[in-house]
A protein has these predicted regions:
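Short pre-catalytic strand/loop immediately N-terminal to key active-site residues, enriched for Gly-Thr
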Residues: 157-161, 181-188, 242-244
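Extreme N-terminal starter segment of soluble prokaryotic enzymes
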Residues: 2-9
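Conserved beta-ketoacyl condensing-enzyme motif
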Residues: 8, 29-177, 220
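Acidic, glycine-rich active-site loops and adjacent beta-strand->loop/helix elements
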Residues: 12-14, 120-123, 188-192, 216-221
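Short acidic, glycine/serine/threonine-rich loops at helix termini
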Residues: 19, 127-132, 197, 222-228
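Short Gly/aromatic-enriched secondary-structure transition segments
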Residues: 20-32
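Active-site-proximal alpha-helical scaffold in enzymes
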Residues: 83-95, 166-179, 183-215, 248-261
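Glycine-/small-residue-rich "gating" segment that lines the acyl/pantetheine channel
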Residues: 138-154, 198, 202, 217-261
């Protein structure tokens, strides 16, 4: 069976520069400084308090989610919201149509031929949500497994886990846009997004889909994520042209990978 030629027809980046290809291009052309003092959880004693945060006015999650799916917003962490915003931007950039971007028109491509491959990191839970449960389970500063199972877990909401499973960004994206083709989530750290794009290209190349939503998303400015990077000595003041230091960021990007035919 002949292989299909694969092309990228749209991009949807989201990050400290804002949302969309134009926002990214503008930031690059104007040398816009993106690393700023973190707006939350300062004074943690980390190697750096700088962070690249998505501006609050970049997008509203209600604008990229149809009314039929808005009840699910309450179980969306920043990683999921970034994935949905990036996907919406990429679809519009590629002039495709889905049941969400163009609800009154016929989707292009066929939903059965639209796949989704996304990279995702280890999503950290909100400290506010875990705080009460941990306080009960660790009255003397050490977690008591028996207390955690008997009393701590009762303080978590029933839908708590649905906010933090790494496959949830792809789950929400495929539901919102009706993508019923091959779907997968790559949880391989920094390589996850590249692996997702590579798999998407292979899916289209062999003819299992006409197009795929491919990329990744992660929130590395979460205090737990920042602390994890600090303890592993991966966090530090980022200095241009030096190979030491790293500045945490949140964001992601989705590409539209299509068959040229």
């Amino acid at each position: 069976m002949p292989l299909h030629n694969v092309v990228v027809t749209g991009i949807g980046p989201v990050g400290a520069f804002g949302l969309g290809a134009d926002a990214l291009s503008s930031a690059l052309q104007t040398n816009q400084p993106l690393a700023q003092p973190a707006t939350k959880n300062q004074g943690l004693g980390l190697a750096t308090d700088l962070a690249c945060e998505i501006p609050a006015d970049s997008f509203k999650i209600r604008d990229v989610v149809p009314k039929s799916h808005r009840k699910a917003i309450k179980v969306m962490c920043p990683d999921i919201e970034s994935a949905l915003a990036a996907t919406d931007s990429a679809i519009r950039h590629a002039n495709l149509r889905t049941t969400t971007t163009h609800p009154e028109e016929t989707p292009i491509p066929d939903p059965l031929r639209l796949g989704c491959q996304l990279g995702a990191g280890l999503i950290a839970a909100d400290i506010e949500e875990l705080g009460g449960a941990m306080t009960v389970a660790a009255p003397e500063g050490v977690v008591d497994v028996q207390l955690w199972g008997r009393e701590g877990m009762e303080r978590l909401t029933p839908l708590w886990m649905l906010k933090y499973l790494p496959n949830m960004p792809a789950c929400h994206v495929t539901i919102v846009h009706g993508a019923q083709g091959p779907s997968n989530t790559m949880t391989c750290g920094e390589t996850g997004s590249m692996l997702a794009i590579t798999e998407a290209a292979r899916v289209v190349e062999r003819g299992d889909a006409d197009a795929c939503l491919a990329g990744g998303t992660e929130d590395r400015i979460h205090p737990v994520q920042r602390l994890r990077q600090h303890l592993s000595e991966r966090l530090g003041e980022g200095v241009p042209f030096q190979d030491t230091g790293a500045t945490p960021a949140q964001g992601g990007a989705v590409l539209i990978v299509e068959s040229l035919e």
